Amino acid sequence: MNYNKLGKTDIKISELGFGAWAIALDWWGKKIEEDEAKRMLKKAYDLGINFFETGDMYGKGKSERLIGEVFKDMRDEIVISTKYGYDFRGVEQIGHSELPQKFDEDFTRMALRNSLHRLQTDHLDMYGLHNPKLNHIRDDSIFNVLDSF
């Protein structure tokens, strides 16, 4: 596996990453059972992948939870990127319907706390906006909140 520095940091990141959306949902194929998902994550790591990309809404936190369970004792050996913005609390998603989005300060802080808890870590290497609309990108207050972390 080839590795590069992540931006201007000293973090070593694999050129290939593991996108963890599919281990939490079954929209376009066979459902992946949790034991199989954990084996997939471990196998990816054994093959040299140390970059795991997820999002809080993937299975309403399931993807993050699985990554946290597998790598809880190896946090310094992996790179985690997650994202937030969809408010899936108390909302039943029908098919591929759009969920409400929130990027305000209170929601951002709550989403971050919840992701850290599910991932069983005290920090993230990357934290992003999940599918923001143009009005969100133009809102400097969102980025001011993110910069405060």
Located regions from the model:
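Feature marks short, surface-exposed loop/turn motifs that line or immediately flank catalytic pockets
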Residues: 22-25, 58, 86-90, 130-133
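Generic enzyme active-site microenvironment
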Residues: 51-54, 81, 123, 128
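Secondary-structure boundary/capping motif
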Residues: 42, 46, 84-87, 107, ...
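N-terminal binding-site loop/beta-alpha segment at the start of enzyme catalytic domains
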Residues: 1-79
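A short, structured active-site edge motif that brings together acidic residues
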Residues: 77-89, 127
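Glycine/proline-rich, positively charged
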Residues: 91-149
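Low-complexity, flexible helical/coil segments
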Residues: 50-56, 87-91, 117-119
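Hydrophobic positions in alpha-helices of CheY-like receiver
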Residues: 71, 84, 146-149
